């Protein structure tokens, strides 16, 4: 399938627009504009004798939709690094299997003798209304509403025998523009030819962003409607997308393209990255965040030598739909320990609760308190870690601690497992995740129990500012750390320096190249980011000077508002 170019000579000059960077990376291709569905749902009253046929037609559309999603999920499960995509598609399958979408729709078709498209669309509309009524406006709600739209479009498409072209069918390099890019559209995309996504609205925490990130497809979003109307005029023209800076360049000159790709090629350097300080000292190292050991070959391919700075072990349960047994865990952890790199890998204990509910255990607690409540689950995970410690060293991170007593308790339980498994020697370094304000102010005591600490910036910002974790709906502020969060990071780093305990940063902030000068100035020793962001961070590091970073950080620590921080970091 091909895309034709734009003939208007007035549109041939290089033209740049800027949105919000969602997924980092550089991509080049023709602009493909996906239009909104043109289907108009009409309300029809059916003769009584056609009602059962209409119900049969609806069941067939549901069955085809389930088959579509099941095929996508199966494909995702079979690919490295696609576990989160599979989880999202599994959630779509669960929604489409909900009795409400069968019993309620069928009941209404029979009772009112209305056509399936109209009844199904009405039911989905009611579900959307109920979501909006019970949830405040957060990116989580937006995600769920988008999931409803995605499923609704798929089923109605089958009912009306109309489907959009799959993004897996194209055979030329494209940058896809869409007002509302859905998770299943992104999941369909072939990253060999789909080189970038651009949407009118979007969020870093959205399901679409998660899919794009897993596929390593750059993504830029959030434009004004006026600017989006301008974008439509450039359908079919050559586009360069810069997911690091949020820049979209239409009709890029050859010199512009060469500059981007030359700079990108220059960052194939080993880790830790060395920053020019006059003495060429390695001030900061970059590590990878992963959800599965299937992502390890991607690290080897994209950024050789990089260690794993955060293995999010709870995603094993999401992928399996249940808690993994000791043997399954030990197999995964052994693969992690044996992966060759420049440093010791970091495994985070199961981090369940709130937005990450355990598939088979419901609890009001989260993070380490969830683990301590579910002691059997914790002991099994510690047993798997103890078994693997025979192979090599491992750093183990305890999530969401509020004080030192929780760390001491986990370590005591681990010692019990060591004693039970005779002949196994402890080969573990224990770390604490600082993501709750109480931990910031108890940091001196926490450091006494920790060989390293990791700042979880997503939750730290949420609990400090009283916001949803999905802060993208705050507009430009979603990218900007609040002065209070910057000061908290500074406090933790300063206390850790006194105890000679290394500090790493993970979360969204760690993958934002604009924040690198701040972290360098604060004295952070390691950033743990998603794999596609690592080379973008390296590119940014090549431009930095330690003295300028220190000067900037002093100004940031004096800032009093979001706006002041934004001026210093992004303008």
From Swiss-Prot:
Its cofactor is Mg(2+). The active site is at 207 (tele-phosphohistidine intermediate), 506 (proton donor). Pfam families: PEP-utilisers_N, PEP-utilizers, PEP-utilizers_C. Belongs to the PEP-utilizing enzyme family. The reaction takes place in three steps, mediated by a phosphocarrier histidine residue located on the surface of the central domain. The two first partial reactions are catalyzed at an active site located on the N-terminal domain, and the third partial reaction is catalyzed at an active site located on the C-terminal domain. For catalytic turnover, the central domain swivels from the concave surface of the N-terminal domain to that of the C-terminal domain. Its EC number is 2.7.3.9. It catalyses: L-histidyl-[protein] + phosphoenolpyruvate = N(pros)-phospho-L-histidyl-[protein] + pyruvate. Homodimer. GO terms for cellular component: cytoplasm. GO terms for biological process: N-acetylglucosamine transport; phosphoenolpyruvate-dependent sugar phosphotransferase system. Disulfide bonds: none annotated. Phosphoenolpyruvate binds at residues 312, 348, 458-459, 469. General (non sugar-specific) component of the phosphoenolpyruvate-dependent sugar phosphotransferase system (sugar PTS). This major carbohydrate active-transport system catalyzes the phosphorylation of incoming sugar substrates concomitantly with their translocation across the cell membrane. Enzyme I transfers the phosphoryl group from phosphoenolpyruvate (PEP) to the phosphoryl carrier protein (HPr). The keyword Magnesium applies. It is found in: Cytoplasm. The N-terminal domain contains the HPr binding site, the central domain the pyrophosphate/phosphate carrier histidine, and the C-terminal domain the pyruvate binding site. The gene is ptsI. This is Phosphoenolpyruvate-protein phosphotransferase. One of its GO terms (molecular function) is phosphoenolpyruvate-protein phosphotransferase activity. Keywords: Cytoplasm, Kinase, Magnesium, Metal-binding, Phosphotransferase system, Sugar transport, Transferase, Transport. Its main location: cytoplasm. PANTHER family: PHOSPHOENOLPYRUVATE-PROTEIN PHOSPHOTRANSFERASE (PTHR46244:SF3). Mg(2+) binds at residues 435, 459.
């Amino acid at each position: 399938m091909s895309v034709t170019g734009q003939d208007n000579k007035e549109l041939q000059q290089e033209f740049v627009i800027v949105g919000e960077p969602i997924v980092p990376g550089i991509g080049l291709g023709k602009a493909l504009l996906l239009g909104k569905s043109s289907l108009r749902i009409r309300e029809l009253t059916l003769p009584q004798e056609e009602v059962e046929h209409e119900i049969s037609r609806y069941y067939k559309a549901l069955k085809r939709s389930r088959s579509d999603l099941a095929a996508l999920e199966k494909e995702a499960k079979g690919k490295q690094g696609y576990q989160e995509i599979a989880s999202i598609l599994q959630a779509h399958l669960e929604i489409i299997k909900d009795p409400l979408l069968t019993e309620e729709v069928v009941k209404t078709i029979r009772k009112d003798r209305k056509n399936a498209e109209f009844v199904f669309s009405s039911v989905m509309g009611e579900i959307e209304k109920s979501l909006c009524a019970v949830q405040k406006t957060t990116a989580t709600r937006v995600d769920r509403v988008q999931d409803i739209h995605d499923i609704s479009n798929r089923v109605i498409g089958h009912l009306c025998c109309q489907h959009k072209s799959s993004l897996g069918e194209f055979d030329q390099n494209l940058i896809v523009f869409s007002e509302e890019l859905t998770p299943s559209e992104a999941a369909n995309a072939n990253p060999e030819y789909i080189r970038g996504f651009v949407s009118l609205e979007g969020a870093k925490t959205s399901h679409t962003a998660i899919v794009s990130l897993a596929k390593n497809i750059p993504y830029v979003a959030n434009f004004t409607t006026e600017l989006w109307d301008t974008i439509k005029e450039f359908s079919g023209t050559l586009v360069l997308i810069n997911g690091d800076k949020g820049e979209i360049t239409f009709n890029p000159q050859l010199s512009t393209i060469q500059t981007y790709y030359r700079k990108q090629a220059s960052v194939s350097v080993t880790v830790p990255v060395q920053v020019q300080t006059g003495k060429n000292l390695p001030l900061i190292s970059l590590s990878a965040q992963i959800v599965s050991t299937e992502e390890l070959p991607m690290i080897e391919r994209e950024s050789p030598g990089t260690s794993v700075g955060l293995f999010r072990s709870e995603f094993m349960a999401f992928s399996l739909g249940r808690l993994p047994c000791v043997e399954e865990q030990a197999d995964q952890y052994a693969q992690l320990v044996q992966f060759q790199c420049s440093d010791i890998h970091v495994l985070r204990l199961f981090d369940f609760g709130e937005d990450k509910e355990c598939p088979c255990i419901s609890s009001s607690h989260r993070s380490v308190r969830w683990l301590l409540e579910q002691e059997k689950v914790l002991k099994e995970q510690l047993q798997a870690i103890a078994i693997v410690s025979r192979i090599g060293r491992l750093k183990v991170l305890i999530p969401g601690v509020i004080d030192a007593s929780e760390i001491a308790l986990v370590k005591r339980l681990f010692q019990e497992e060591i004693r039970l498994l005779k002949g196994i020697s402890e080969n573990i370094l224990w770390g604490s995740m600082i993501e709750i304000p109480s931990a910031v102010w108890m940091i001196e005591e926490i450091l006494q129990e920790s060989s390293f600490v990791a700042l979880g910036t997503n939750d730290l910002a949420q609990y400090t500012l009283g916001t949803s974790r999905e802060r993208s709906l705050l507009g430009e502020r979603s990218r900007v750390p609040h002065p209070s969060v910057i000061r908290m990071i500074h406090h933790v780093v300063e206390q850790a320096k006194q105890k000679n305990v290394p500090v790493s940063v993970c979360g969204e902030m760690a993958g934002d190249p604009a924040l690198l000068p701040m972290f360098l100035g604060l004295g952070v020793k390691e950033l743990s980011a998603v794999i596609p962001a690592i080379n973008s961070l390296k590119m940014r590091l090549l431009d930095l000077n330690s003295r300028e970073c220190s000067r900037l950080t002093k100004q940031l620590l004096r800032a009093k508002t979001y706006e002041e921080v934004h001026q210093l970091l992004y303008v």
